[in-house]
C-alpha cells in the first residue's frame, strides 16, 4: 500500500509522515531529503562543472532504504544529516528539482523503493505525478506565518528573520506551482487538510479512519 503526503514547505509533512508510518508500521520515505541530497552533491566543487547527464550516470551520492531502516542519504561513504537542512542546499534543491532529467531520475528511484513494502511517501508531487494511483493521498496546507515559525525551528538560531523566511516560502510556493515539470498541485482524490491550528495527533485522528483496514 502507498500513502502520499504532499504540500508546500512548513505544513508539517515530515512530522505527519513519520508519525503515520510509525502508527501503521509502514516504511517512510522523505523525497525532499532525496532532492536535497542531489543538491548538496552538486554544490561540491568537484561536481559543479560536470555535465548533468554524467553527474546522474555516476552519482557521488547514494541512498539506503529497507524494511529495517528509513531512508538514509550518503555522499561517498559519509552519512548526510544536518548538511541537508542548510538554507543554501534547500534553495538550490528548489532550482535543481526543476530539471526534467533530475525529476525523471528521482521518480525512478522512488518507484523502486515502493516495491520494498507498504510505504508513506512525502513530497510535492507524490500523489499527482509519481504515485497517481496511491490508495490514500493527503495534501497539507497551512498559513504562511505558521509555516515560517515551523521552519525557523529547523534552522540555526538567527539564520533568518521570520518575515524574510515567510517571503522565501511564498516565493518557493509560486515557483513550485508555476514550474513546467511536475508542478505542485492538489492531487485528484486527495484529502486536503489545513494544519495551521492542528496538532499531529489531531491530523492523525482525521486520517486514520479514512484508511481501509484491509489495505494495512
UniProtKB/Swiss-Prot annotation:
Keyword Membrane attached: no
Reaction(s) catalysed (UniProt annotation): CMP + ATP = CDP + ADP; dCMP + ATP = dCDP + ADP
GO biological-process terms attached to the record: pyrimidine nucleotide metabolic process
Binding-site residues, ATP: 7-15
GO cellular component terms, A-Z: cytoplasm
Family the entry assigns: Belongs to the cytidylate kinase family. Type 1 subfamily.
Protein name: Cytidylate kinase
Species per Swiss-Prot/TrEMBL record: Chlamydia trachomatis serovar L2 (strain ATCC VR-902B / DSM 19102 / 434/Bu)
